Amino acid sequence: MATYDEGNIFAKILRGEMPAYKVYEDEKSLAFLDIMPRAPGHALVIPKAKARNILDVAPEDLCHVMQVTQKIARAVMKTFGAEGVTIQQFNESAGGQVVFHLHVHIVPRKAGVALKPPASEREKPEVLAEHAKRLAAALTAT
């Protein structure tokens, strides 16, 4: 298994070297919006621990990420009027992983509405800012 790359974009976000549309943060995790969302409200949850993917993360960090994923999923559904939610997590290149820091996708869904293709179109910053504000407010209220 490959080693953790300190230069990955999520590590840079955690260090404050790259901006992100943050919606939730605690001592062990960070949640923010995907800048190329497959649907409005598409969020990502990452551990603050250095973990390439699910294969090398400490069990307690994985458990915490999943607890936060559930919290974000509930808020995403309520905030964006979703009827369901898709949770995705990829491991290694052959498994579809592109950014090599463990992350979980939370994609709100509505019946009959197709998702945009992955990494297809960058959302406008003002739209992401508004979505982040709404989702962060919903998470604060819970």
Which residue ranges define each predicted feature?
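HIT superfamily nucleotide-processing domains
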Residues: 1-142
